[in-house]
């Protein structure tokens, strides 16, 4: 019986990890939808909040190795919990922010929150909790769950933005993020499992990686892919909203959405789907 549990694919750890990534990246993919509402509310240029999104992405990248080191020293669950707290705190305080500088600063907090509750720590737990035969598939499923968040998040945010102000939507997202912490206790691996520990330090690992052409190509691939996806999710919804004519009731497009804002959200969801 124990052997069957160890060899099963859809473990509680896999499901909990997938849900954490799905929720986290669903929220992250919606920030582009807030450009126009925030700009119109404060009479700013859209570039002010788009800069905040750019800072968020930089903070996510910078925070990833920091949280990986934190998880290695203090435990993955503590790292993920801290990430979710920072994520929720940054979004919640952003709902009350009234200056471009405050939004830009708070997106540093949000970016670090994404780093702490994102792919790095979660995939590490899922990988260790899964049998060798199922590990690749389990990691693929968990990663796909994070990508699925982009399909779910923007349409959900567009619905909320159509019935309430952007600040209230931020508050809802903050509450959802903090509630996600209830999934963290499920992320535990088998303490009796024999895991080989490497004596290699960080500098040796980096030196070896830099000398590996495969790593360089993988790094460049992620860099280009991440750049274009971040650019599209940040600017595409606002671009569609500003460039499109009002949607005419009874037209073909009105079957799937009733405003240009929801059309932008649907576009991001379709990009995430394919």
Predicted regions and their residues:
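Helix-loop-helix hairpin linking two adjacent transmembrane segments in secondary transporters
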Residues: 142-189
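Conserved MFS/SLC helix-loop-helix module at the cytosolic interface between two early adjacent transmembrane helices
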Residues: 62-100
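Extracytoplasmic gate region of multi-pass secondary transporters
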Residues: 31-35, 213-262
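Extracytoplasmic
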Residues: 12-46, 64-67, 232-237
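Residue-level signature of mid-helix packing/kink "hotspots" within the transmembrane helices
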Residues: 29, 57-65, 150-151, 258-266
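Cytoplasmic helix-loop-helix junction between adjacent transmembrane helices
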Residues: 107-144
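Juxtamembrane cytosolic amphipathic helices that cap and anchor the N-termini
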Residues: 7-16, 207-221
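Flexible cytoplasmic inter-helical loops of multi-pass small-molecule transporters
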Residues: 188-204
């Amino acid at each position: 019986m124990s052997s069957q549990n160890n060899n099963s694919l859809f473990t509680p750890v896999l499901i909990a990890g997938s849900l954490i990534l799905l929720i986290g990246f669903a929220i992250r993919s919606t920030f582009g939808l807030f450009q126009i509402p925030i700009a119109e509310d404060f009479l700013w240029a859209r570039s002010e909040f788009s800069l905040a999104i750019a800072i968020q992405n930089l903070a996510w990248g910078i925070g990833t190795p920091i949280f990986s080191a934190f998880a290695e020293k203090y435990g993955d669950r503590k790292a993920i919990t801290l990430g979710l707290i920072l994520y929720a705190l940054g979004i919640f305080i952003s709902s009350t922010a009234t200056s471009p500088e405050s939004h830009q600063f708070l997106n540093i907090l949000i970016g670090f929150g994404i780093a702490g509750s994102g792919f790095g720590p979660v995939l590490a737990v899922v990988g260790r909790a899964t049998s060798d035969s199922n590990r690749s598939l389990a990691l693929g499923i968990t990663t796909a769950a994070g990508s699925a968040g982009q399909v779910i998040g923007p349409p959900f945010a567009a619905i909320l933005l159509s019935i309430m102000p952007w600040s209230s939507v931020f508050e809802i997202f903050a509450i959802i993020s903090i509630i996600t912490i209830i999934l963290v206790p499920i992320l535990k691996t088998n303490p009796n499992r024999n895991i080989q520990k490497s004596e290699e330090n960080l500098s040796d690992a980096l030196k070896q990686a830099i000398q590996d052409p495969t790593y360089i190509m993988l790094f460049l691939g992620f860099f280009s892919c991440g750049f274009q996806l971040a650019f599209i999710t940040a600017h595409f919804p606002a671009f569609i909203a500003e460039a499109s004519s009002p949607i005419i009731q009874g037209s073909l497009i009105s079957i799937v959405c009733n405003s240009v804002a929801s059309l932008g959200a649907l576009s991001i969801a379709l990009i995430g789907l394919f």
